[in-house]
Amino acid sequence: MIKNLFLALFTTTILGFFLKNTVENIFIYNNSIKPILIGMLFTAIILFISTKIDKSHRSLNTLTRVEAVKIGLVQAVAIMPGISRSGLTYFITLQSGIKKEEAFKFSFLLAIPTILGAAFVETITNFKDITTTTAL
């Protein structure tokens, strides 16, 4: 399971670095609420579908490398506003046939390094702005 967590995290990190500036330019700096609403609607649909999935029978130990990469890719897509990272990773893990409890576990274990890493990158990227603001 640890190897799959690292593989999913690595995939998220690589794709996230490529998507970050594009997503910020398209969705965040255009001052429109529409992308957020679309993302939230998409998340609601995915979560609704998740409640209907009943093919979960496998344990996390049976998760393949390809499935771990898919989970990492989906998590990177959640960089878009309004899209739930945990909802998407839970959904794709369920789609892989993993038991619901273990899908939640994997999703939240994956969240810890992802969120800490994103916070670190944002802090380093915006450090100049942070120090300038606090100096006022």
Sequence positions of predicted segments:
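Multi-pass membrane proteins that catalyze or facilitate reactions on polyprenyl-/lipid-phosphate substrates
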Residues: M1-L136
